[in-house]
Amino acid sequence: MTPWVPAVRRTVPHLPEVVLSALFVALFLVWSWLVLTGCTAAVDRIRPLFLPPRSYAGQIAEAFSLVTHPLVIVIAIAGVTVFSFRRRMRRLALALTVAAAGIPLQTILALTTHRARPHTAFADSISHFGGAYPASHVTAMTLGAWVLVTLTRAHRRPTSSVAQWVGVGVGAVALTAACQWIMGLAHLSDIVGGLLLGAAVANLALSAGGVDSILSAWARLGLPRESTDKRAAVIFNPAKFDDLSLLRRRVEAEVLAA
């Protein structure tokens, strides 16, 4: 009975992420059923004005679509994952691996549902590949924005800086969604599906890696590894803190940074 109690308590910090992940998965499944049964046909009939591919706006949209291509995003996330693992930030590497896995998962779902893309003048674009549901670029950019915000938080930035990067991430996702819709590469329902899938995988990644573990590991980045003569006095309640190794890493990071 004694070993079982700490195991239960260790899951408590991850509970919000697990709940949010389950919620977004449920919403994604419900929305997918509505889309694939044709219940969102009225929403999908809302179409943007025709955008000539060779116009200035068309070329800018296609260039942005290339930058936010899922292959580009997954390579970027994989690079940060390898960097994190080599720096022994294994919890962060685990979370990033789960996030990166969301992009091939989207590809599998798109091939499985095999939903036709809307008629578009950008049919020859490199972004026009695979099925339409869920929207590939939106899913990838949602995960990419999550990685950006997570790394910003983990790098111990001020609250105002974190808020700014959250705004940048949200803006990038919104711009990606608008670009995909304006180019006629995705229906509105496909975009909503991409957002829900990306949010579900992002919260699953957080629950797998653990917020506190990620923040503690990244906080030590760039700090001296050699021992110092600095000391710290810590007063804590053992009944409320079961992960002593995490406490030690956080205290070491604070001492080395002081």
PLM region spans:
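Membrane-embedded catalytic cores of phosphoryl/pyrophosphoryl-handling enzymes
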Residues: F122-G222
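ATP/NTP phosphate-donor binding region
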Residues: S213-A258
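Alpha-helical transmembrane spans of integral membrane proteins, capturing the lipid-embedded, hydrophobic core
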Residues: A22-V25, V74, L96-P104, V173, ...
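Membrane-interface loops
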Residues: I75-A76, F83-T159
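Hydrophobic alpha-helical transmembrane segments
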Residues: S32-V35, V80-R86, A178-I182
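Alpha-helical transmembrane segments of integral membrane proteins
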Residues: P16-L23, R90-V98, Q164-V168, D190-G193
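Aromatic-anchored segments of alpha-helical transmembrane domains
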Residues: F28-W31, A100-I108, G171-W181
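N-terminal transmembrane-helix/juxtamembrane module of multi-pass inner/ER membrane proteins
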Residues: M1-V72, T112-S125
